[in-house]
């Protein structure tokens, strides 16, 4: 229905990157996949904490800290991006993935773990059904 809504609103296409993160062809790590299958997928927001530029992602510890009252404003891109990647890499060595940029759109909770070709077929079938 999301694709049909975008097209009905005048768009010529719909961006659906998040829909493909759970596909086996994706390079997403296990933590990213687990979060997309959890309640976390229902809480996304635009933030510039990770990169210094606004982008939508799942809320984690870094987002909560970086957006809290009194937190410093993120550095401009690419400094914020480099710093966040280094912080995440260090935390990940201890098994902590609370500092990873896990980008996700507003429909993240609708993600499905299907091979990419199958997902495209399903999305087209659903679009055709909605459009009648």
Predicted regions and their residues:
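Conserved active-site-proximal phosphate/metal-binding subdomains
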Residues: 2-132
């Amino acid at each position: 229905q999301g694709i049909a809504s975008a097209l009905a609103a005048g768009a010529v296409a719909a961006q659906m990157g998040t829909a493909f993160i759970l596909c086996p062809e994706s390079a997403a790590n296990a933590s990213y996949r687990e979060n997309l299958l959890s309640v976390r997928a229902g809480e996304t927001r635009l933030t510039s904490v990770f990169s210094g530029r606004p982008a939508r992602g799942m809320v984690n510890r870094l987002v909560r800290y970086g957006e809290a009252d009194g937190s410093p404003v993120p550095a401009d891109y690419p400094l914020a991006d480099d710093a966040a990647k280094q912080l995440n890499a260090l935390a990940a060595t201890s098994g902590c993935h609370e500092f990873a940029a896990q980008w996700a759109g507003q429909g993240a909770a609708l993600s499905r773990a299907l091979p990419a070709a199958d997902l495209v077929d399903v999305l087209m079938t659903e679009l055709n059904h909605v459009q009648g």
